[in-house]
Each structure stands twice: as structure tokens, then as C-alpha cells.
């Protein structure tokens, strides 16, 4: 009887320890979601609110190489925002100047960051700060006017380094 009690106690403690370990283990900080172009602002708000410094979301065409990426920056407690990053690479070469023209036509300031190596030679970078409307509208226009996709197109939102919902 006493040995049965000890055995049950050992299994009980082991189950509790395993449960605590599984509950406290690091959870994934990335996830995929299929969205319509009308959901871009919601996704960018999620990145801004729950993303870690340098967290990002990539909006991409399923089964295609075309994408638009936004990253989050945190410079200090009061200075955080979103940055659009559009690469100059073999797949995007045909779109690169069109993205620049779109930004210039909208009066949006951008900078070009040289990477100096690899297939991605440079990035167009736009600091949207906390302007979710501007960021979402620009992203949507890149998909519709530059990539020439139908407004009803669904894209994949791939989040990286974004805290899970509570």
C-alpha cells in the first residue's frame, strides 16, 4: 500500500513538472495567415503593437516570389514604428523602378540602402513611423499597381518575432 502511494506520488509530481515545463516553454513567435488586401492595416497594427524590435511581416503572393516586407523598429521607449523594405533582387528587378515611381508620385520619402553582397543588391526603405493608413495604402498600391494583382487577391502574411495573442 505504501509503495503504491509513493508510486502515485512520483507520477503525480512528474505530471505536474511536465505540465509546468510545457506551459512555460518558449512559444513560437511566428505564424502564417491568409488575408485579403483589405486586411493589411490590421496586420500592420498587429506588428506595431505586438512585434519585437526587428520583428517583421512579409506579405507575399502564394506560389510566387513577389512580396512586400515591413519591419518594426524600437529606437527607445517613445520611438517605435514600421519600415517598408523592398529588395532589388533578380525576382524584383522588373518592379524596382516602378516602386520608386509610385513612392515619388505619392510624395513619400524613401532611401536606398546598399547591401554590397548577395543576390539582393539594395533595398528601398520607407519609414512610416506609426502611420498605419499610409503603410497599408502603399502596400496595397504596390500589389495592385506594380504587381498588377486583382483587388480581391489573397496574400500570405508571414509574421516573424511577433508575440502571440494573450
Task: For each feature predicted by the language model, list its residue ranges.
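Feature marks short, highly hydrophobic, charge-poor N-terminal signal-anchor/signal peptide-like helices
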Residues: 1-11
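Core hydrophobic alpha-helical membrane-spanning segments
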Residues: 9-19
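Juxtamembrane cytosolic interface motif at the C-terminal end of transmembrane helices
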Residues: 18-26
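Structured alpha/beta or helical-core interaction and ligand-binding surfaces enriched in interleaved
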Residues: 25-166
